[in-house]
């Protein structure tokens, strides 16, 4: 722990040279510090040059407790884990969680290396009841994860978050299974989706998937939404990374809104990402 704290102080001294490392997390102006941290990273490494720096979102509420989210360059999302009596307090608390994770992300142990990949694959095998042989088989979920990590060698886990979230969502809504049935390899799927960001276009396509599921299993969207909201709240209160749970909530909310406003909605628009487009790529 002492070594980790010393490493964090060293990182703060490098990225925020005019800040006192001992006072960083006690500074009430943590919102500006988080912004300064990522601006400094962009200047030093040209990281995420085409993206905004830090984006905040406050949930509408008539009164406390208030909830605020902050999304970092690369896609990682964090929220306030404390019970906050004002929107400003919630925003500061979310920024503090994000800053701590941003600093930890600079540690060597958070960079994707061969050793990191080996440890991550072993953890994935343990959590899926698979075997290490699965890591060499790209048709398995562990193999796909292994391939994604190797394709992003040298990046940090926060830089890897956007692509990871996309594949978590594709697995969650059944798209990966559907793509396997069309004979698309995991490598082709990864190469295809690596070109895209998780934006409104992709959310609309995934919402359409759930609209179709609702027709086969009435009530499944509201059931999944309740689960996603519970997962999001539990993860936020635990100070965990939230992007996957938050995107699930956004996609399901969009699907439910469309179902309620137009029960006959079923046709995708031409500009939406679709399985057909990927099969054409294949």
UniProtKB/Swiss-Prot annotation:
Organism superkingdom: Eukaryota
Disulfide bonds: none
GO cellular component: a single term: cytoplasm
GO BP of this protein: autophagosome maturation
Family: Belongs to the LIX1 family.
Protein name: Protein limb expression 1 homolog
Organism, as annotated: Homo sapiens (Human)
Gene name as annotated: LIX1
